[in-house]
Structure formats: C-alpha cells, structure tokens
C-alpha cells in the first residue's frame, strides 16, 4: 500500500472514533507510510460536532490529529489547509501553530493547498450526521426538519457561509437546468425556501450531488502558505464527465507559477519543487519528480512571460506550452495528442 487516506468529514470516515484512528496511525508508523487526512472539520462550525459554541470545530479537528499522532513519528499529511466560511479565517494562526507543535514533538506533519478560494464537495457537506443516518420517513417528520432548520440557520450565521455560497455543479441526468446556479437562486426560481430546495436537491441526487462552494480561503492566506516550508501544492481537482467543472482543473498550478514570477509566491525553483520532487519524496514515488538519468521523463514546459502576465480564472489554462508524460509528448501548444494521452500514463508502483 502507498499509505492510508482518510476523509473524516465524509462517510464512512465520519463514524471512526479516536481509538480506531490510533490503530490506523500505528499501522502507518509500522510500515513507514504516510497518513493523509481530510480532517473532521475545516470550518469554525460544522455538522461534525454537536455544540455550535466553544472551541472552533476546525481546531477541534486539529486537536484530534494531535491526539492520535501523539508520541509517534507519523508521516501526517493534512490535506488540505482550507478555512471554510468567512468566520473561519481567524483560525489560520492557531492552525499553523498546531502544525509547528506537531513537528517539534516528532510528528512529520505537513499540509497542502490549492490556489483557489473555493472548492468542490458533495452536496451533503452541510448536513449533520444524525440527519444523514435517518430513513426517508424519519427525515420527513416536522420535528426533525425543524431541528435541522434551526441548526443550519445558526451554523450559517456563525460560519459566514450560506446557500448563496453553494453552487450546484451536478445533480444527475435531467437536472442540467440547476448547474451553475446557487441553491438560493434555484429556490427563488421554484418559489421555495432555501432549505426546502436544498433538501430536494439532495433527494434528487440520491445525496450524491456535487457542489462548488466558498470561500475556502483568501488570497492573503494562500500567499502566506506559499512561503511555508511545510506546505505542498495540489489541485484537489479532476475532470468530471458531467456538470460544472472545478475551476482548479484549468489553472491552479499555473497560478502558483504566476505568483512566483510576480514576486508574491515562493522562488521559482521552490515553487516547481513543491509540485514535483517534494511531492514525490513525500509519498515515496520512485523515479519521479526529478530530472535525473534513469528517471521517468515527466515534463511541463511553460512560457515565463505569458505565465506572469496572464489573466487567471478564465476557465482555461495559461502559459503551458508542452507536456511530456513518460517521455512522450502529449500536449504541444494547444494541440492535444489524445491517442498518446490514453497510453502513456501508468499506475505508479510504490
């Protein structure tokens, strides 16, 4: 195995308790494999904890990672450092302090970021665990719906995040009319409350719909983390067959390069390394990430001037001139060799 990846905010990870997680940590340490964790909460308040008040849920989730890794040399990858909702931005300082403390106490802790202030999630991300576990009949009971309504409204106020910030990316065949619109916009068009429309969308997607939402971060936080020595770069994106795409698929990495060339990001060598060699090292990928004899020739050629002066967020990439996968040219300027693209990639052995 390459390691273990946990999504503690989602099923089935959200049901894992501390003792079970400690066993996973022990296993990773035994075989010197990384544990990549999407924490239980990445916002000031969330549906992962019962109490809406007191310590930030984001920081409680960090406390859990501290607890399960205490006294170990675990290779812990926090994926990813985001702060969902405007009221969560203030947790950034303590988040960094916790990461530093982990390292000071022997845990090989790192985190990663993407160069976007929004992100993609499943439509159920704002539904509490107890509601998701109910039968359809139980969900229809007025008392349960009232409890849910009060909880979501309170969370929205405390978080600085609401249905106006949740854009539908995909519900399913026949529901294309919803794509690209916020839950609030769809509710208004259908003469329903935001909550009723949201629950209907959950049902129509069989609770598997996809959403784009934010804010997850700020340009200032991203700029700061670009200089943090324990931060790697990633996209958190993949091309979907249907619906609205995650904007990060187009220009997330070019934007990191653009920041570097404009002097707001890390140095260019460090920026490239965070995307390549440092990531290969972190996940122990053999013969990847470096330009060395005997290594696989995975190259991206970019135009510095074009990258530096481009306008980002235009649903297209910029600055990338050539891409080689395993030594074969798959992108030459704007011409994509689809045949080569299908055959040049390979599963990585670890």
Question: Model segments located where?
Answer:
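Acidic, glycine-rich active-site loops and adjacent beta-strand->loop/helix elements
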Residues: 10, 41-43, 82-84, 278-279
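C-terminal cap of metal-dependent C-N hydrolases
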Residues: 137-139, 223-230, 235-236, 247, ...
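Mid-to-C-terminal alpha-helical segments outside catalytic/metal-binding sites
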Residues: 195, 270, 274-278, 298, ...
